[in-house]
């Protein structure tokens, strides 16, 4: 059921919980407000995709367990949710994509996210979260996109034991992260790395295992030393931003005449295009056979 971009107002009706057979529900971009009805969280046990984005929903996010045992995609971004990230999300063991960004969530990032073993995309940017980033997030075998930008996260980036798992996109800009950038962070899978506007120090790590990185954004830190010459060997890079650091030495000759798409408007536009393309190509959940009685033949593009 697609009810997006209408003029619906008031609270979400409790009767939503009576739709036991529904698999797809998108009521984004309306003016619903208030909290999620308990009857809704306890019903709709056939839901596979639920989109509640861009509304005025408030109070806690999933403070208790729900019956959404089959859900693969949950989008609750751009609302007014407050409080801690609810433990009710812990029961969504089939979840592949979770977006709770652009809310007013506070507290720390729960360590139990690593129990969602099928999770490919976790987006919690633009909230009020604090504390350290749990090392368990970086070792998840399936997690490919992790977006924690624009919070108040602090501490060092962990020296992840397994080389940051399957991560391809890591967005940590506008936090209070400190310490050095671990060599293991630039693993063989990373495509986009955004660490802008933190308090990171030390040298830019070597790019020994990096093969596919397209975007490297390190602006606004306290990085020192020279620009690694090994950057010249990273042929895949599209965007490179090292401004507002404390770097010294000479610019490698391979970068002096490089065109990195930093013209007017090109920076943000290209970053958006590449990340959006990544989401569609690697993470999107697509329905096929929409006209058949079984709506929900799902395939994950990889």
Swiss-Prot record:
Repeat positions for LRR: 1-19, 20-43, 45-70, 72-91, 92-115, 116-140, 142-164, 166-188, 190-211, 213-234, 235-258
Keyword Repeat: yes
Record's protein name: Putative receptor-like protein 16
Keywords noted in UniProt: Leucine-rich repeat, Receptor, Repeat
Endpoints of the signal sequence: none
Cysteines paired by S-S bonds: none
Superkingdom of origin organism: Eukaryota
Similarity comment text for this entry: Belongs to the RLP family.
Alphabetized Gene3D superfamilies for the sequence: Ribonuclease Inhibitor
């Amino acid at each position: 059921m697609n009810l997006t971009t209408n003029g619906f107002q008031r609270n979400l009706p409790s009767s939503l919980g009576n739709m036991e057979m529904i698999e797809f529900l998108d009521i984004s971009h309306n003016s619903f407000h208030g909290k999620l009805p308990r009857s809704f969280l306890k019903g709709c046990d056939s839901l596979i995709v639920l989109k509640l984005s861009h509304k005025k929903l408030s109070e806690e996010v999933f403070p208790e367990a729900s019956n959404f045992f089959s859900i693969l995609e949950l989008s609750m971004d751009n609302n007014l949710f407050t409080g801690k990230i609810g433990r009710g999300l812990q029961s969504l063991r089939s979840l592949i994509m979770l977006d709770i960004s652009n809310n007013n969530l506070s507290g720390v990032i729960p360590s139990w996210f690593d129990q969602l073993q099928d999770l490919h995309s976790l987006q919690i940017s633009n909230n009020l979260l604090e504390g350290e980033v749990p090392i368990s997030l970086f070792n998840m075998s399936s997690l490919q996109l992790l977006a924690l930008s624009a919070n108040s996260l602090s501490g060092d980036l962990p020296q992840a034991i397994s080389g940051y798992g399957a991560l391809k996109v890591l967005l940590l800009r506008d936090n209070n992260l400190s310490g050095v950038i671990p060599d293991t962070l630039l693993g063989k899978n990373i495509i986009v790395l955004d660490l802008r506007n933190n308090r990171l120090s030390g040298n830019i790590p070597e790019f020994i295992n990096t093969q596919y990185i397209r975007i490297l954004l390190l602006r606004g830190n306290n990085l020192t030393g020279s620009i690694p010459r090994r950057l010249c060997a990273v042929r895949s890079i599209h965007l490179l931003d090292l401004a507002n650091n404390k770097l010294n030495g000479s610019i490698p000759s391979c970068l002096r005449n490089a065109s990195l798409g930093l013209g007017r408007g090109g920076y943000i536009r290209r970053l958006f295009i590449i990340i959006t393309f990544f989401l569609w190509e690697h993470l999107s959940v697509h329905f096929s056979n929409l006209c058949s009685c079984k709506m929900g033949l799902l395939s994950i593009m990889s």
